[in-house]
Amino acid sequence: MTRLLRLALISLCLVPTAASAHVGIGGTGGFAHGFMHPLSGLDHQLAMILVGIFAYRLGGRALWLVPLTFVSVMALGGFLGVMGVTIPFVEADIAFSILALGAMVAFNVRAPLAVAMGAVGLFAIFHGHAHGSEMPMDASGFEYGIGFMLATALLHCIGIGVGMATGALSRPWGDNVYRCAGGLASIAGFALLLRCF
């Protein structure tokens, strides 16, 4: 028992003490930090996966244009954040984007392509701004931006994969899974929204 206790204490001493939060100080890699930023927050993960599911459900050209719009406009939002441009209520806007995207998935909103691209583009501004404004001071803006854009595209692909897997289920089951997943995401978005005030 004492040997196990010693091993546990030594292991605890080797654990890094830095918190894994959105904002970092000290030496950071621009690309790695940017890549991890969307993956480290449930708000970003939910929204970006929902964009992929929404794009899959729309089908056709929306399958690639909706995620591409999100990533492109998010880069603009990131630039605004890095430049210090203030956008009011960014965290509340991000929470609302989850609520809205969840509802769009749950209710199978069949928006015209331009409307769908406009909606996800609007949401992307806020997500990008959050990424950009939380970039570490010593990170390369270009590398950081490439990192968070790549991670976002990966999350969109996961969402498309989830959409494909759910769509492969038999008729009533697949629709029910979409409704439940979208509804739960909307509830999560609403809960995050309440925390902002």
Place the predicted regions along the sequence by residue:
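Membrane metalloprotein/metal-transporter helix-bundle signature
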Residues: T2-F197
